[in-house]
Every structure is written in C-alpha cells, then in structure tokens.
C-alpha cells in the first residue's frame, strides 16, 4: 500500500460559513484564554470529605461552563503536582476568563488557583464540544 506526499498535501476547500460559525479569522484561527490550574494555598485546610465535595462542585462548574459554550477544553495533568490541569476558554480577554474562573468552587475555596494566558489557536477547537459527547462512554 503506497501513499504519495501529494495526497496529504491537498488543501480542503475553504468553508466561509463554517469559518464564520466558529469565529475564525482569515487564517482559521481565533483568540482564546488558556488557564493553567495550579494547586491552591488552602488545600490542607480541608478534610478528605470536604475536598471531595469541592471537587464535585468543580466538575459541575466545568459542565456548566461547557454547556454555556464558554469552556472548550478542560482536563487534568497526568502527574499532578503544582500544575493540576488546563482550561481553554472561548473568550478574548483575561478579564472575561477571570470572571468565569471565579465561578469555580475550587477557586473560591483556595484549593485551586489560575494562571491566565491569552492564546491564539485554531478555531477548529470550537468543534470539540460537538465531537466529545460521541466519544465519552462514562460521566465523571
């Protein structure tokens, strides 16, 4: 079975309707804000049971933000430590993202804190929220 380089290098036809729907610029990109979730300063103040309840609220908040179309990507880092995970928000400014992060029970409790960075990435990320439910067999 052989493949030619040309078959992989072909460019798909530009879809102006899809680009507009996803908020893409002429490069197929858009502005987001990435949030690095870091271990908060107050983790040790809570019992195991309290942290479990805070985590439950954190997960519910993730679902709410995703349902509102504001949170595009969320997930933990595998090895834990100081860096706990990431969010990618469909907002253009850190101020908008900060307002969203302040709705999180884990942030409010000081179990997590956020480092916010404006990011320029593919507008195709906006399609993840349509694809992910087709791949997810279990809820968290």
Regions of interest found by a model, annotated:
Residues 1-12:
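Bacterial Sec-dependent N-terminal signal peptides
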Residues 10-140:
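Conserved, structured core segments of small domains
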